[in-house]
Amino acid sequence: MGFERTSSSLSLLSSSLPSSLQPSENTRAKFSLFYLLLLFFVLCVIATFTITPTSTSSPYNRNSNSGTLGNFYAKEEGKSTVVIKKTRKIGDRSKEAELRRILRGLGSSPPRCSSKCGRCTPCKPVHVPVPPGTPVTAEYYPEAWRCKCGNKLYMP
């Protein structure tokens, strides 16, 4: 009654299998299916690593041939602290462009508003809160850049 197999249960098992697949052939078929699935999985993993974009096309990787030290300014409660971090120089940027990037600080850069306000002058970029389309009272609205001349705001 336990978990022992008797010869009658084996004969019953072999009689229920098709005549083309005996117990040893059935096991062999399962193993070959397992190896085919394993091979398919390995090929998928290899294809994933070979098809992914190179490091030069990623906007987050800053790889180059010449390495330089860069200064990064982190704002902390109204104070500006200098953090020295190893970075690599991208392409042939000039020192002024590198300095502008460092001094600009965190966040998005302001747009060029020279021709966005029409004939109105001076046209300056400003940060403005943008409420959502539906009327919702919130403590925080996301901010966006707009060009401002006088009391009017223009899309950059």
Curated annotation (Swiss-Prot):
Describe what happens without this gene. No visible phenotype in wild-type background, but restores stomata to hypocotyls in a tmm background. Chal and cll2 double mutants are defective in growth, with a short stature, shortened pedicells and compact inflorescence.
**The UniProt record lists the keyword Secreted:** yes
Cysteines joined through disulfide linkages = C113-C147, C117-C123, C120-C149
Q: In which tissues is it expressed?
A: Expressed in the internal layers of the root, hypocotyl and stems, and in the midrib of developing rosette leaves. Detected in a ring of cells surrounding the vascular elements. Expressed in developing stems soon after bolting, in inflorescence stems, near the root apex and in the chalazal region of ovules. Not found in cotyledons or in stomatal precursors or stomata.
- What start-end ranges are recorded for coiled-coil regions in this protein? none
Q: Which InterPro entries match?
A: EPFL (IPR039455)
Cellular localisation: Secreted
User: Carries keyword Secreted?
Assistant: yes
Q: Name one GO biological process term.
A: stomatal complex development
- Please tell me, according to the UniProt entry, what happens when changing P122S: In chal-1; derepress stomatal production in a specific subset of tissues
Gene Ontology cellular-component annotations = extracellular region
Q: Which family does it belong to?
A: Belongs to the plant cysteine rich small secretory peptide family. Epidermal patterning factor subfamily.
The record's listing under PANTHER family reads:
EPIDERMAL PATTERNING FACTOR-LIKE PROTEIN 4, EPIDERMAL PATTERNING FACTOR-LIKE PROTEIN 6
Assembly and interaction partners = Interacts with ERECTA.
This one is known as EPIDERMAL PATTERNING FACTOR-like protein 6
Q: What is the species listed in this Swiss-Prot or TrEMBL entry?
A: Arabidopsis thaliana (Mouse-ear cress)
